[in-house]
């Protein structure tokens, strides 16, 4: 599905810092400016040079909380969660899609997501893409033990699914320190059994424990020993799980 021509015509562009609170601030400000029917939204990660008629929005946490509260009250917490999920998409138009869908939902109800409305349709598709990639990584993500006993894993997702993965493993590994490194975005999330911290790092220094090195070799040996060469089917493997997701598997596929 493609946006109609009016989508690309000259219209105010709201430029923000790329954070979810920043996007919520845009929703508040654009509504106050009565520009909610025709606007574009860009984050600083997508656009480095401002044009003459761009509107730069500073993140306002109080306005963001008001928008959150209003969405939960007039729509639902589930709708807000869908916004958060869509926000993790790598699609460069996600910001504009979310904002327009929110405005329409506030007028017509969250049932708009079940319609063929262009923005709602695109938002649903982005949500499905994010959740699908998260599901794939839940199946292939491999933790390895570092010398300090922290469990470490590396991912290279297309979408920014690190926050969604952290919430899952935090519930599963409550008493275990772990870190997940998003190599694509040079971002790492660290859980110390109490809280999660997310920060940026280009290349973390890693030292595996002696036990990890031993078990990794044992696992590779086991994986090879149970494999029946005559029955290998790489095409079927790639059909079930694209090779893109094999990069950081301990075993040799």
Model-derived regions, located:
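N-terminal ordered "arm"
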Residues: 2-61
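Short, hydrophobic/amphipathic alpha-helical patches that form generic packing surfaces
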Residues: 22-33, 100-104, 167-171, 216-224
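Intrinsically disordered or highly flexible coil/loop and linker segments, enriched in small
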Residues: 37, 77-80, 136, 175-179, ...
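Charged, alpha-helical interface segments at or near domain boundaries
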Residues: 41-135
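Acidic, Ser/Thr-rich peripheral helices and adjacent loops at domain boundaries
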Residues: 57-63, 196-208
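Short coil/turn segments at secondary-structure boundaries
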Residues: 82-86, 183-184, 232-238
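Internal, well-folded beta-alpha domain core
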Residues: 111-200
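Long, compositionally biased intrinsically disordered terminal regions
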Residues: 177, 188-189, 207-253
């Amino acid at each position: 599905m493609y946006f109609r021509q009016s989508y690309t015509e000259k219209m105010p562009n709201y430029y923000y810092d790329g954070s979810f609170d920043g996007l919520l601030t845009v929703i508040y400000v654009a509504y106050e400016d009565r520009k909610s029917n025709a606007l574009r939204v860009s984050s600083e990660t997508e656009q480095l040079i401002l044009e003459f008629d761009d509107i730069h929005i500073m993140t306002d946490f109080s306005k963001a909380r008001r928008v959150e509260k209003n969405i939960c009250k007039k729509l639902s917490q589930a709708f807000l969660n869908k916004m958060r999920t869509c926000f993790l998409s790598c699609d460069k138009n996600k910001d504009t899609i979310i904002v327009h869908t929110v405005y329409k939902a506030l007028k017509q109800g969250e049932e708009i997501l079940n319609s063929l409305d262009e923005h709602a349709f695109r938002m649903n598709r982005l949500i499905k893409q994010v959740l699908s990639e998260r599901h794939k990584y839940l199946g292939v993500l491999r933790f390895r033990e570092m010398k300090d006993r922290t469990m470490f894993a590396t991912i290279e997702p297309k979408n920014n699914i690190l926050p969604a993965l952290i919430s899952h493993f935090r519930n599963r590994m409550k008493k275990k320190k772990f870190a997940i490194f998003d190599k694509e975005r040079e971002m790492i999330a660290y859980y110390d059994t109490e809280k999660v911290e997310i920060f940026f790092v280009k290349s973390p220094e890693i030292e595996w424990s002696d036990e990890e090195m031993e078990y990794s070799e044992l696992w590779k040996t086991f994986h090879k020993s149970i494999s029946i060469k005559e029955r290998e089917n790489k095409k079927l493997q790639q059909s079930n799980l694209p090779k893109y997701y094999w990069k950081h598997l301990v075993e040799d596929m």
